[in-house]
Amino acid sequence: MAKTSAVEKNKRRRTTVANQAAKRAGLKAIIMNQALPIEERFKASIKLASLPRDGSKTRIRNRCEVSGRPRAYYRKLRMSRIALRELGNLGKVPGIVKSSW
């Protein structure tokens, strides 16, 4: 089981990203627009740098919904391989059966 603080920090980052997404996208569009003067683009760059770092989408870590584990994460199922195996063996995940041949 992952530390509760790490899971909560990641949740807080997700909300920050959601709140800052439109503002960051607007500033990035200004920065990338070659038609605008360099001074205006530089000011937008400074504003973007002053926004909270946790507002960046790359700061989010995919974590298992069951255990909070950050590694070996299956995006489709939103859980780690260990939680998938445990729940699959119990028959809690539809369509997952232990293979035998």
Curated annotation (Swiss-Prot):
Cited PROSITE patterns: RIBOSOMAL_S14 (PS00527)
Gene Ontology molecular function: rRNA binding; structural constituent of ribosome
Keyword list, A-Z: Ribonucleoprotein, Ribosomal protein, RNA-binding, rRNA-binding
Function statement: Binds 16S rRNA, required for the assembly of 30S particles and may also be responsible for determining the conformation of the 16S rRNA at the A site.
An individual GO BP term: translation
Quaternary structure annotation from Swiss-Prot or TrEMBL: Part of the 30S ribosomal subunit. Contacts proteins S3 and S10.
GO cellular component terms, A-Z: cytoplasm; small ribosomal subunit
Protein name per Swiss-Prot or TrEMBL: Small ribosomal subunit protein uS14
Bilayer-crossing regions: none
Segments forming a coiled coil: none
InterPro entries: Ribosomal_uS14, Ribosomal_uS14_bac/plastid, Ribosomal_uS14_CS
Protein source organism: Rhizobium johnstonii (strain DSM 114642 / LMG 32736 / 3841)
